[in-house]
Design a protein with these regions (language model features):
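Short, low-complexity, intrinsically disordered N-terminal peptides in bacterial proteins
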Residues: 1-29, 156-164
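Conserved N-terminal beta-strand and adjoining loop/helix that marks the start
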Residues: 14-44, 65, 96
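Active-site-adjacent beta-strand/loop module that shapes the phosphate/pyrophosphate-binding cleft
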Residues: 39, 87, 96-120, 127
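Short loop segments at secondary-structure junctions
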Residues: 39-42, 50, 114-119, 132-135
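Conserved Nudix-box catalytic region and its N-terminal flanking loop in Nudix hydrolases
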Residues: 43-82
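Short secondary-structure junctions
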Residues: 83-90
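NUDIX/MutT-family hydrolases
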Residues: 112, 121-155
Length: 164
């Protein structure tokens, strides 16, 4: 699994968030490994962003930035151990999306994770919730919304992906 190529041979979509806000012209693209943890009942894990981070309190799939020389799978394994205390047994590269936030330009490399060991421990004082469509936690991070749309398509779900 490469750390810079899309997970699937599809074009990478760029989504712009808060387009009216200024952006620095010299922002580097930040590679992020994102774990989409799915239980046997098809519920998926969302965690809240910790205080002190951009979009604190928003709900997202757990993950984090790649370090120099890491693959997506290596970064995901490290980040999920550091942030939520689990060890992933395997992951499947799934989708890739670029999000242009005012504070950062990120490439989100989503991986499905169905097998892990350990109990969830929110090591950054974040909250967690196992969700189904439509998700009931709010607010949802803009970078998370495409995943909910992909789930809806895969699961033939019709309706809002985030409850009103």
């Amino acid at each position: 699994m490469s750390s810079t190529e899309p997970a699937i041979n599809e074009p990478i979509t760029v989504r712009v968030v808060d387009a009216q806000l200024p952006r620095s012209a010299d922002r580097a693209l930040v590679q992020v490994a994102v774990g989409v943890l799915i239980r046997s009942d098809d519920s998926f894990l969302l965690t809240s962003r910790p205080e002190g981070k951009a979009y604190a309190g928003y709900w997202e799939f757990p993950g984090g930035k790649l370090e120099v020389g890491e693959t997506i799978a290596q970064a995901l394994k490290r980040e999920l151990q550091e942030e939520i205390g689990i060890t992933i047994e395997d992951c499947m590269s799934w989708k890739t999306e670029q999000i242009d936030y005012p504070h950062a330009l990120v490439q989100l490399n989503f991986c499905k994770v169905r097998r892990w060991s350990g109990e969830l421990q929110m090591r950054e004082a974040q909250l967690y919730a196992w969700q189904q469509l439509p998700v009931t936690v709010k607010p949802v991070l803009p970078g998370t919304l495409p995943v909910l749309e992909w789930f809806a398509k895969e699961r033939s779900f019709v309706g809002l992906t985030v409850a009103e």
